Amino acid sequence: MTAPEANTRRKIGIMGGTFDPIHHGHLVAGSEVANRFGLDMVIYVPTGQPWQKADRVVSPAEDRYLMTVIATASNPRFHVSRVDIDRGGGTYTVDTLRDMRSQYPDADLFFITGADALAQIVTWRDWESMFGLAHFVGVTRPGYELDDDIIPEVHKDRISLVDIPAMAISSTDCRQRAAEGRPVWYLVPDGVVQYIAKRGMYQAHPGS
């Protein structure tokens, strides 16, 4: 009798974000989720034009992309995609997932995002169709609980929460510190610190 074939489908994490700048919380989150779910790789996807952040100045996409490349370079499981940047127009998660599904048709996708963002998922474009494209992982500070009323019962098995202590770091705080001339060492990777300084980023518009 032939033994059943092992499940050979790859498991790929997709972490979308503005990454303005990327910080250690993003990297720890990717590593922890990869370990928790046995992911083969985690692809960081910097947004092109984030529709949720039209109320503040966002750094140029190329700067955010390069900072993400620098930050992830030392981890062979981490990769960076330009799919959202090169698509043009507003960035919507459903488009990201459809593009990734086309690129990796034989993989199980896990979309990694902040639990606070996940709490707003019903406001996202074509949000119900996204659950057929990926499992959603909300990373959060320890003790956070997602309101049971937010997600319809039918989709709750497609969502997991993972506590990440390092999520106490925020890009907003990093931008503000840089704007005020305060150090961001140990909040963001060394190469990103140097990139921010070289480019003089966040001096005029720290954002919110």
Swiss-Prot record:
Q: Which family does it belong to?
A: Belongs to the NadD family.
Q: Which GO terms describe its molecular function?
A: ATP binding; nicotinate-nucleotide adenylyltransferase activity
The record's catalysed reaction(s) read: nicotinate beta-D-ribonucleotide + ATP + H(+) = deamido-NAD(+) + diphosphate
Q: Which HAMAP family match?
A: NaMN_adenylyltr
Q: What class of enzyme is it?
A: transferase
Keywords, in A-Z order: ATP-binding, NAD, Nucleotide-binding, Nucleotidyltransferase, Pyridine nucleotide biosynthesis, Transferase
Reply yes or no: does the keyword Nucleotide-binding apply. yes
CDD domains from the entry? NMNAT
Q: Which Pfam families match?
A: CTP_transf_like
The EC designation for this entry is 2.7.7.18
Per the UniProt record, the source organism is Corynebacterium efficiens (strain DSM 44549 / YS-314 / AJ 12310 / JCM 11189 / NBRC 100395)
State the source organism's domain of life.
Bacteria
Q: Would you tell me the protein name for this molecule?
A: Probable nicotinate-nucleotide adenylyltransferase
Could you provide one GO biological process annotation from this protein's UniProt record? NAD biosynthetic process
What is the gene called?
A: nadD
> Gene3D superfamilies given for it?
HUPs
InterPro entries in the record, alphabetically? Cyt_trans-like, NadD/NMNAT, Rossmann-like_a/b/a_fold
Report the pathway entry. Cofactor biosynthesis; NAD(+) biosynthesis; deamido-NAD(+) from nicotinate D-ribonucleotide: step 1/1
Record bears the keyword Chloroplast: no
What this chain does, per the entry, is described as: Catalyzes the reversible adenylation of nicotinate mononucleotide (NaMN) to nicotinic acid adenine dinucleotide (NaAD).
